[in-house]
Amino acid sequence: MKICFLDGIKIPYTSKDINSNKIRGAENILINLSSEFANLNHDVTIYNNCDNDEVINNVTWKNINSINDKPYYDLAISNNDIRLLDNVISSNKVAISHSIQSLEKFFRKKQFISYLKNKPKIVTLGNYHDKNRNYLIKIFGSFKINWAVDQIFIDTEIKLNNNSCNAIFTSHSDRNLDLLIDIWKKYIFPKNINKKLYITPYNKSLEQFNIHNRKFEDKKNLLNDLSNSRVLLIPGHK
């Protein structure tokens, strides 16, 4: 099969950046999915804002601005932006959704017309996204895939420091960091002032609560931070 992925994110990246701190989960998914398709001997092309056209591990990377004459693919997959599917011809179009998108946001992001035009199936990530996404944004079909783990986390053995009193938060601050900080200040820190919470960069100084900023670093450094922590805290949805 001829398969293409389309990603409009402005950050230039390829699969060489899989362990870099400049990409997020959405880009990781694209890299890993494309790699698995290539391993199954499919002809895979990724259109994004990469600096140079190149072939890496049997996956062709092309700058998205180079698309012309609407090339044909057996399967076209958009990474979060349905409008990108306007640029290719395919009888099988798919859009990966990385969030629970309201109808209001769907219209505001100018996705609706392209959605009706391309009629893509929507890929949701896990039961929560599948259950809570508006059914009108799944009228052409949907299916879910579960979150996976990057190979570096499978291959690396973490030696836990059981004497550590550190907790760590590794997501971006828009992933309910405010909620976590509030819980820490009210319920955790008062019980033990020696416990430390390391978070992604925050716009306020919170060291009086033993909350410390940590940099967004590559995955090798992240593994080191995890090994020096007792618990990884991930606040749920409000």
Describe each region flagged by the PLM:
Residues 1-48:
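N-terminal subdomain of nucleotide-sugar transferases
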Residues 3, 43-44, 93-94, 142, ...:
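Hydrophobic anchor at the start of a short beta-strand
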Residues 45-120, 127-128:
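Extended catalytic core of nucleotide-activated donor transferases of GT-like folds
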Residues 151-223:
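Conserved catalytic-core segment of nucleotide-activated headgroup transferases in glycan assembly
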Residues 227-238:
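Acidic donor-binding loop of glycosyltransferase active sites
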